């Protein structure tokens, strides 16, 4: 859908307002009247831009997914066949930053799959499949060549991603558990060390203990 240039700023404002409210309240918990109020327009004007509420939801999700791609250093590590001790910290750096810098995106994806499941896979596939497919291929290669334990690469791909998204919230539900980390750099180290300890075969892990400790990649 395209709009006259003079209206594009207003449309962007509507989409931004919708993303905020849908992420906070869910799809069914958000009304177009609330979105119009937050965007400082009338509800009639909103419907001139978006005929249906669902159209606005998908526009807001696409706006948050736009530009999401693997970073250059991570892509290079994957394509060059760098070891897991190099690539996993790079992967966790991107996952942690996404969780911190794009919190609305994660909530919108959850809302899409819970409340609008019939189209969620199609929209998310367009943007997320290239990312997860590249990571999955890398993990599969390293499983095949013995650098990682023999596990299902697709399950591992899902586990790596969801651990970053879910672990901080689960920790809050465990009585007496300390905060999992103090900042994003420590978070990258925590997840990298944990998963390398879990995934690297014992004989390779012994060799890794002689190498410098895993740190977050430079910003």
Predicted regions and their residues:
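Short hydrophobic clusters on alpha-helical segments that form packing/core surfaces
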Residues: 14-22, 95, 195
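Short coil/turn segments at alpha/beta junctions that flank glycine-rich nucleotide-binding fingerprints
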Residues: 24-28, 102, 145
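Amphipathic alpha-helical linker/stalk segments
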Residues: 60-91, 138-143
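Short secondary-structure transition hinges
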Residues: 86, 97-134, 155, 178-181
């Amino acid at each position: 859908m395209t709009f006259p240039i003079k209206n594009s700023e207003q449309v962007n404002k509507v989409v931004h307002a919708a993303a905020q409210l849908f992420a906070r309240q869910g799809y069914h918990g958000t009304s177009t009247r609330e979105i119009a109020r937050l965007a400082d327009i009338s509800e009639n004007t909103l419907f001139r831009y978006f005929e249906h509420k669902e159209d606005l939801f998908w526009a807001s999700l696409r706006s948050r997914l736009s530009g999401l791609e693997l970073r250059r250093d991570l892509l290079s590590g994957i394509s060059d066949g760098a070891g897991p001790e190099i690539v996993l910290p790079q992967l966790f750096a991107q996952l942690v930053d996404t969780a911190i810098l794009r919190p609305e995106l994660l909530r919108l994806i959850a809302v899409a799959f819970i409340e609008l499941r019939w189209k969620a896979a199609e929209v998310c596939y367009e943007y997320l499949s290239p990312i997860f497919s590249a990571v999955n291929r890398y993990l599969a290669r390293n499983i095949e060549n013995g650098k990682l334990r023999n596990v299902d690469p697709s399950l591992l791909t899902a586990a790596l991603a969801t651990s970053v998204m879910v672990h901080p919230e689960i920790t809050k539900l465990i009585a007496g558990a300390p905060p999992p980390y103090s900042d994003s750099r420590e978070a990258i180290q925590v997840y990298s060390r944990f998963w390398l300890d879990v995934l690297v075969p014992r004989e390779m892990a012994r060799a890794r203990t002689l190498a410098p400790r895993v740190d977050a990649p430079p910003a």
